[in-house]
A protein has these predicted regions:
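C-terminal luminal/periplasmic domains and tails of membrane-associated envelope-modifying transferases
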Residues: 418-435, 452-708
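Extracytosolic helix-loop segments that constitute the early lumenal/periplasmic catalytic or substrate-binding loops
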Residues: 37-44, 55-85, 92-95, 257
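Transmembrane-helix motifs of polytopic, lipid-linked glycan transferases
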Residues: 110-133, 171, 175, 308-311
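Start-transfer (signal-anchor) and selected internal transmembrane alpha helices
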Residues: 1-40, 233-241
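Short acidic/glycine- and proline-prone juxtamembrane loop motifs at membrane-interface regions
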Residues: 112, 151-165, 352-353
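Membrane-interface transmembrane helices that cradle and orient dolichyl/undecaprenyl
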Residues: 133, 172-192, 202, 374
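Transmembrane-lumen/periplasm boundary regions of multi-pass, lipid-linked membrane glycan transferases
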Residues: 57-63, 67, 201, 205, ...
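Signature aromatic-anchored transmembrane alpha helix within multi-pass, membrane-resident enzymes
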Residues: 4, 28, 242, 318, ...
Length: 708
């Protein structure tokens, strides 16, 4: 009888636990559903056009969806073709967004459903983390405060990488926390693999995930090394992360470095953000917290934590000395990773307000603990019912303030007649592939916005912004057909752009098609090349001549790539490349040593980021040349770009057995030593100490002494 009674009691307890879990999950679903309903309502009322970054991310998602073959008129072109679509930013978020677009639609509001999915995952992750730290109440309340946070509410409706990055980093840190816990709770293979996959996924969304994940990962890894099972798990986890990153990084590492430099170093300097050594860096983000988290949410949280510290003020010194021993389990980890993320983000040269987003969920967990501490104190003073009523009132007030702030940000007009311009072009061009040129950089009229809008709803229009250089004016006029110009302020103060606008209006080759009223007494004008004007000259013959100029060495590189850069603006589809490739292959069928064709194909492969194929063409040029030339130098360079460093070192040794001029020999010695160093050959770093300076001097001599 006693045993049956005990079994019955255990069954009742299990049923209660299941019921509580159901209520907990239903609460999270309700939180997500209510916040998503508000977001969709906000999006349906806000009519603004996607601006610079938003439009660029939408275009990237569109391209990746087409690259997967999920969106028309795209098709699957292999892994390399897919990796070509993400030269500067990792592709995971764009791949997910493009896949969701295939279901929801390509328009920005419909594509934003992917943000709701990221938001749901963030709610669950934060709630589970809170539940581990302080039970169900902490988890649910953290989810509520997350939804009410003004910054997170903004990220939920702004199509960018901020919400995907925040979600992936929070998930990675939570799974890393679970794995680093003492056995048998932590330290399992499943936890290690899950943490590794989540870290890899976060890095494949944006490189800046390193700011939040690098130090915690190193911290956990160092703690795991003395423990044999965890040491093996650490090695396997590192292998998993590298395996996820390497395909994209190997394909795009050069453009990634260049893009990161512009986005972080150059952009931060232009915006006047404090440098790494500037003390203002450390208070840059804390001063934004009232606006980011909400003044009431932050005040109550800090008050609760401050009250707890005051009540335990005699133990503060011991707490500072031994936080791991004094604080409840899990809280030292949360505080540690929050501080690491805040410090690393503060030290980044570019300090846009949204870059602190991955740290906000962890701050919200800490603030939520302060809320619960206030509730506990209130229960002792005024009773349980009144304290919970006060909590609900504070949540409602916070919700009202958050909704008020977001509602005031709604824009009920598009901001510019950009869609009307694109519809007119699409109608007149009969849906054919079209490039639209412009000089303006207004929030509602810029190349990113027009390019995205020009690629949806059956349109096939790309927009490009010209006028950065006065020398390009004549080339721009000679090779363009469609222009969109504006009167008044166009968001740019460069005289070269203003002069280009006037040149289009005065050029007899162009005619005004239509005008639209804009705001502030401005107008938008659509100009088209007259049918009677001379035909646009193709770039094919000029490209062949430029490619042959590679024979002249480093002196030719800058003018070659400068001209190709402007041509890629004029021809964003790179249509000339297919024509040149067809021409070159036909020439080689009749003459296998045709130098124009060989150099053209080699340069094409370099521009297409196919270093392996470029190497084959440079070797072909070497084999048919009567004497040694710069093709050998280029071959080593593309092999290094392809990470085939050992092969490059071996080839350089062979090249040095032949006769080269002094400048070529200096470069060969430096490239050989660089290849050896990258191949972990100790002779490499030693040799670079003496070979690097002569190589640089030879390049400078070539540039200063020769011209194409």
């Amino acid at each position: 009888m006693a045993s049956s009674r005990r079994i019955k009691q255990e069954n009742i307890i299990n049923v209660k636990r299941v019921s509580i879990d159901w209520f907990w999950w239903l609460a999270l679903i309700a939180i997500w559903a209510i916040s998503t309903w508000f977001d969709r309502t906000w999006l349906s009322n806000d009519q603004r056009l996607p601006s610079w970054d938003q439009a660029e991310y939408l275009s990237s998602a569109l391209e990746h969806g087409r690259g997967l073959g999920l969106l028309a008129p795209g098709e699957w072109n292999g892994w390399q073709g897919l990796l070509d679509l993400s030269p500067k930013i990792p592709p995971l978020s764009a791949l997910i967004s493009g896949s969701v677009m295939a279901i929801t639609g390509e328009a920005s509001d419909k594509a934003s459903w992917v943000l709701s999915l990221w938001h749901g995952l963030l709610i669950v992750t934060l709630a589970m983390w809170g539940r581990v730290l302080g039970g169900r109440k902490l988890g649910v309340l953290a989810a509520v405060l997350l939804v009410l946070s003004p910054a997170m509410a903004e990220h939920r409706v702004e199509f960018s990488l901020d919400l995907p990055l925040t979600t992936s980093c929070t998930l990675a840190l939570f799974l890393l926390f679970q794995w680093q816990r003492p056995a048998p709770i932590g330290g399992t293979w499943k936890q290690a693999i899950a943490a590794a996959l989540s870290i890899g996924a976060a890095l494949l969304i944006k490189q800046s995930a390193l700011l939040v994940l690098a130090l915690p990962s190193i911290w956990v890894g160092l703690r795991a090394l003395p423990v044999k099972p965890r040491r093996r798990q650490t090695v396997v986890s590192i292998f998993i992360v590298l395996s996820l990153l390497m395909p994209w990084l190997h394909h795009n590492w050069i453009t990634t470095i260049g893009g990161t430099q512009r986005a972080v170093l150059i952009s931060g300097a232009k915006e006047g953000d404090p440098g790494i050594l500037n003390p203002l860096s450390l208070i840059w983000y804390p001063r934004l917290m009232p606006d980011q988290l909400g003044i009431l949410i932050l005040t109550i949280g800090i008050a609760g934590i401050g009250l707890a510290l005051w009540n335990n003020r005699k133990q503060i010194y011991v707490l500072i000395q031994h936080p791991v021993k004094i604080l409840p389990k899990g809280w030292p980890w949360l505080i540690g990773v929050t501080l690491m993320g805040w410090i690393c983000t503060s030290l980044s040269p570019n300090k846009d307000a949204r870059y602190i987003a991955p740290v906000l969920p962890m701050l919200i967990l800490l603030i939520t603990k302060g809320w619960l501490l206030i509730i506990d104190q209130a229960q002792k003073k005024i009773g349980r019912n009144k304290s919970w009523a006060a909590l609900i009132a504070c949540i409602l007030v916070s919700g009202f303030l958050s909704i008020k702030q977001r509602w005031e940000d709604i824009v009920i007009t598009a901001g510019s007649p950009a869609v009307n311009v694109l519809e007119t072009i699409n109608r007149l061009s009969k849906g054919e592939q079209t490039t639209l040129f412009m000089v303006s950089s207004d929030r509602n009229l810029n190349e990113q916005t027009l390019s995205y809008l020009g690629q949806i709803n059956g349109r096939n229009i790309q927009a490009r912004r010209l006028g950065r250089n006065k020398d390009h004016e004549e080339l721009s006029l000679a090779q363009s057909k469609w222009w969109v110009l504006a009167t008044g302020d166009q968001g740019t103060s460069r005289k070269s752009r203003q002069q280009l606008s006037r040149a289009v209006r005065k050029d007899s080759r162009f005619e005004l098609i239509e005008t639209w009223d804009w705001d502030d007494n401005r107008q938008i004008e659509l100009w088209r090349r007259r049918n009677t004007a001379e035909a646009i000259e193709k770039f094919d013959n000029r490209f062949i001549k430029l490619a042959r100029g590679l024979e002249k060495g480093p002196a030719a590189l800058e003018p070659i790539f400068k001209e190709i850069e402007i041509q890629h603006l004029l021809d964003p589809g790179f249509n000339y490349q297919q024509r040149v490739e067809t021409w070159a292959n036909n020439r080689l069928q009749h003459n296998q040593i045709d130098q124009d064709a060989l150099w053209s194909l080699a340069l094409l492969r370099v521009l297409q980021n196919r270093p392996g194929k470029a190497s084959l063409w440079f070797r072909k040029i070497e084999s048919v040349s009567d004497e040694q030339n710069w093709a050998s130098i280029y071959n080593l360079t593309v092999l290094l770009a392809d990470w085939k460093t050992c092969k490059a070192a071996w080839l350089a040794d062979n090249y040095l057995k032949s006769t080269f001029n002094k400048d070529e020999s200096n470069l060969l010695f430096a490239l050989r030593d660089l290849s050896r160093a990258a191949c972990f050959d100790p002779r490499g770093p030693i040799g670079l100490a003496t070979s690097l300076k002569p190589a640089i001097e030879s390049v400078e001599k070539q540039i200063n002494g020769d011209s194409i």
